[in-house]
Amino acid sequence: MNEVFADAYQISGDTKYLDAAKRFSHKWLFESMRDGKDNLDNKHANTQVPKAVGYQRVAELSVQAKRSGDAVDYTRAAYFFWQTVTANRSLAFGGNSRREHFPDDADYLSYVDDREGPESCNTYNMLRLTEGLFRKDPKAAYADFYERALFNHILSTQHPVHGGYVYFTPARPAHYRVYSAPNEAMWCCVGTGMEN
C-alpha cells in the first residue's frame, strides 16, 4: 500500500498521498531496517519485500517533495533490507525464501532440505527494489544481483513448451519443479510470472 500511495503522490503532486504512504509503511519493519536490525527470521518473505519496495518509493519521492529527513530514513530502510536479504538470506541464483518464509539467518540447511524452495514472487519483487535503489545510486552490486536473479531464477520460471509458471524453485539435489497448468492454476507466482 505504501508504494501505491507514493505513486498516487507522483501522479497528483498532492502531498496527502505521500503522507498516506508513510502511514501505510509498517513501523515494525521500517524502524528495524532503518536502524540496521535484521528481524526477518521466519517472517513471510513476500509480505516484507513489497514493504521495502514502498520504502524505496517513499524515499525517492521525498527528495522531490523536499523532505530530506524522510528521504534519508526511508533510503536507509530500503537499502538495509536489500543488503541483508541479498547478502544473508539469498541463494546463489537470487532466490531468498523457503516455504514462503525467510528462514533463520543461520539456517542454511533448510534451503537444501525443503522441497518448497525460493518463491519466484520474492525474486521478482527484489528485482523491483533493486531497480529503484539503482536509479538513485547506480552501484555494480545492484546490477550484479539483478543479473544473477534475472538469468538464474526469473527466466527459468516459465515452462519452455506449455508456458506454465513455477511457484517454488527447490535447491534440493535431484529435485524437480512444478509448473502451473495453463488456464487452470492461478497461484500468486503465475500472476507475477506474467509480470516478469
PLM-predicted stretches and their roles:
Residues 1-196:
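Glycan-recognition and catalytic cores of secretory/periplasmic carbohydrate-active enzymes
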